[in-house]
């Protein structure tokens, strides 16, 4: 009997394929996105040492009081603006965008646009 893969399993396979090519360096770290049903998370990671340099999500206290809903496009854009601001403060200007196996559409695109508005270069 043929079993159909779940959406999340397909996303994970796509993400593994993309991660073979996308690698964060100290000069150009990786901006990684994770999307759940209620929240969106973003991290800037240096893959050579395996450390998270900057992170932001809809769970951050400064965004929690500002946002009414944490699962919509406006919330994702705010997370993008916040991670961009924090990255610029740490001296990070250029990043490689890792969409996490998700389509570049909706909340993922809004986060990327917010990060670009804050001054990050992809």
From Swiss-Prot:
GO cellular component, one term: cytosolic large ribosomal subunit
CDD domains in alphabetical order: Ribosomal_L18_L5e
Keyword Ligase part of the UniProt annotation: no
Keyword rRNA-binding set for record: yes
Residues spanning the signal sequence: none
UniProt xrefs under HAMAP family: Ribosomal_uL18_B (MF_01337_B)
Subunit field text: Part of the 50S ribosomal subunit; part of the 5S rRNA/L5/L18/L25 subcomplex. Contacts the 5S and 23S rRNAs.
Stated name of the protein: Large ribosomal subunit protein uL18
Organism: Thermotoga neapolitana (strain ATCC 49049 / DSM 4359 / NBRC 107923 / NS-E)
Lineage summary: Bacteria, Thermotogati, Thermotogota, Thermotogae, Thermotogales
